[in-house]
Amino acid sequence: MTLEAYFPVLIFIIFGVVLGIALMSIGRILGPNKPDPAKLSPYECGFEAFEDARMKFDVRYYLIAILFILFDLETAFLFPWGVALREIGWPGFIAMGVFLLEFIVGFVYIWKKGALDWE
């Protein structure tokens, strides 16, 4: 496949970036700029904020998010593998078996280390 086949994609990306920058610039130039304390305060259910809007999150939230992404990617690899299993044969089956075994070992490791405990 030659690079000429990707030329429409490049044009589409350039057009999207230019259009996005143009629309944001027009909004910045033509939009009203009247800041006041009520507009700059964080909104919380119709009341004044009880605490600072930027609270520290527990590290466990990030850990759960990273684990979700990892296992979501695992699922993203499993679907095409399942569709193409007849064409790829035993080598593909063994490769996915090793891949799944690594994930299972990693999951058991983080479970035994207590990374999934919320106490």
From Swiss-Prot:
Entry annotated with the keyword Transcription: no
GO molecular-function term, one example from the UniProt record: quinone binding
Organism of origin: Cupriavidus pinatubonensis (strain JMP 134 / LMG 1197) (Cupriavidus necator (strain JMP 134))
PANTHER family per record: NADH-UBIQUINONE OXIDOREDUCTASE CHAIN 3
Record-listed E.C. numbers: 7.1.1.-
Name of the protein in question: NADH-quinone oxidoreductase subunit A
Subunit-level organization: NDH-1 is composed of 14 different subunits. Subunits NuoA, H, J, K, L, M, N constitute the membrane sector of the complex.
Keywords of the record: Cell inner membrane, Cell membrane, Membrane, NAD, Quinone, Translocase, Transmembrane, Transmembrane helix, Transport, Ubiquinone
Organism placement in taxonomy: Bacteria, Pseudomonadati, Pseudomonadota, Betaproteobacteria, Burkholderiales
